[in-house]
């Protein structure tokens, strides 16, 4: 992706990278109204940044990555106007031990399961599971994090991360805040020829509980939920054929004492809440330039004794004009059965809720990498 590299000496390099994605979409029902609108980053997050490496010898490298996500609609950076809100980390890698990173970065759910999900791979926010409850799209990035990733050992890789709360007092105002707004996670992946398998566990404690003048592991500007505890379990699998890539993932998110959610005006607190997501997706490489992509997700939830469930289907056709530039047509449909719960209105991620139980979105766009 780097368009050029700045070289300090033969063993060091810094590269500029980025992506811009824009679309025009028609939605059938947002608050009871049709809409035609400009959509920034519908299939992938628009971002620019720098990444670099310095060869330290003996199989060791110093590495870093800075990434700034931005809105192509108005040019603002996000989330919350951060200069490097996407990535800001530095680390060391060793060819036999693995890689250690420190800073702001993607969580382990994205690391291990992102490639198996349309929302985390080619479909973007519109294909995320309802409310992005498992963070497979990446609603939140992680602050104050230390992450380890092993090398491949006969196809097996593993790793984990811990993110500090940076807080001295507990939410209640007394005692230690060490466990408030912290995150820890672990994952494993196995690859053998055309087959890939992965599993991950991630836990957040009091996410969105900001430290005055600083940030916890997941601050309120990023959090997909605010809750006393959020646990995410997930597995994924993929199989690559000659012209078809097949993937599937199953995730479960359990919330204790949830009080808020990142986009849903329907949300009200409950003593507990859980979501189960089942997704299958495929990419058919019709020609060297044309890809046909599709995904289906079925989500069930348990909310205050109610059992809402969602069906979501998405289809995307992408045509590459070059290695860097492509055109696409995209469509997503969602239908929800609310079962008398607070989730009685369809809401494709990033849209306003519908006035009923179904919502559809159709559009075209252009994407350029540099």
Report residues per predicted region:
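Sec/Tat signal peptide C-region and signal peptidase I cleavage site
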Residues: 4-10
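Outer membrane beta-barrel
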Residues: 11-27, 35-167, 180-182, 188-200, ...
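Residue-level detector of the transmembrane beta-barrel scaffold of outer-membrane proteins
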Residues: 15-17, 61-63, 99-101, 157-159, ...
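Gram-negative outer-membrane beta-barrel proteins
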Residues: 24-32, 70-76, 108-112, 166-170, ...
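Extracellular loop and loop/strand-boundary signature of outer-membrane beta-barrel proteins
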Residues: 33-37, 76, 132-133, 170-174, ...
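Outer-membrane beta-barrel architecture
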Residues: 49-51, 89-92, 147-149, 187-189, ...
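Detector for outer-membrane/organellar transmembrane beta-barrel domains
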Residues: 179, 187-314, 333-334
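Outer-membrane beta-barrel "beta-signal"
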Residues: 321, 356-370
């Amino acid at each position: 992706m780097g368009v050029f590299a700045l070289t300090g000496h033969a063993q060091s390099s810094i590269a500029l990278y980025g992506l811009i994605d824009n679309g025009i979409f028609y939605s059938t029902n947002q608050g009871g109204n049709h809409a035609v609108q400009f959509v920034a980053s519908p299939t992938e997050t628009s971002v620019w940044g720098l990444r670099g490496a310095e060869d330290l010898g003996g199989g060791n490298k110093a590495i870093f990555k800075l990434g700034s996500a931005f809105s192509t609609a108005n040019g603002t950076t996000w989330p919350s106007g951060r200069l490097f809100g996407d990535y800001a980390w530095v680390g060391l890698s060793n060819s036999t031990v693995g890689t250690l990173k420190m800073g702001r970065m993607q969580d382990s759910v994205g690391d291990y399961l992102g490639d198996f999900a349309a929302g985390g791979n080619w479909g973007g926010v519109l294909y995320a599971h309802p409310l992005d409850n498992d963070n497979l799209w990446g609603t939140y990035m992680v602050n104050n994090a230390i992450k380890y990733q092993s090398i491949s050992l006969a196809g097996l890789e593993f790793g984990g991360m811990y993110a500090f709360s940076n807080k001295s007092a507990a939410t209640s105002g007394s005692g230690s805040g060490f466990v408030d707004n912290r995150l820890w996670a672990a994952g494993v992946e196995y690859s053998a020829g055309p087959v890939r398998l992965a599993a991950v566990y991630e836990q957040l404690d009091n996410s969105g509980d900001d430290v005055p003048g600083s940030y916890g592991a997941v601050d309120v500007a990023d959090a997909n939920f605010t809750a006393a505890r959020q646990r995410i379990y997930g597995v994924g699998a993929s199989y690559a054929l000659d012209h078809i890539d097949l993937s599937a993932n199953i995730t479960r998110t359990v919330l204790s004492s949830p009080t808020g959610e990142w986009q849903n005006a329907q949300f009200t607190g409950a003593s507990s809440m859980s979501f189960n997501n089942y997704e299958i997706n495929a990419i058919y490489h019709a020609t060297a330039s044309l890809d046909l992509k599709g995904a289906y997700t079925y989500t069930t939830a348990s909310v205050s004794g109610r059992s809402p469930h969602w069906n979501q289907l998405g289809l995307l056709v992408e045509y590459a004009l070059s290695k860097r530039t492509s055109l696409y047509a995209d469509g997503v449909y969602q239908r929800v059965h609310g079962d008398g719960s607070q989730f009685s209105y369809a809401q494709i991620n990033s849209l306003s809720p519908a006035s009923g139980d179904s919502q559809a979105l159709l559009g075209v766009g252009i994407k350029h990498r540099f």
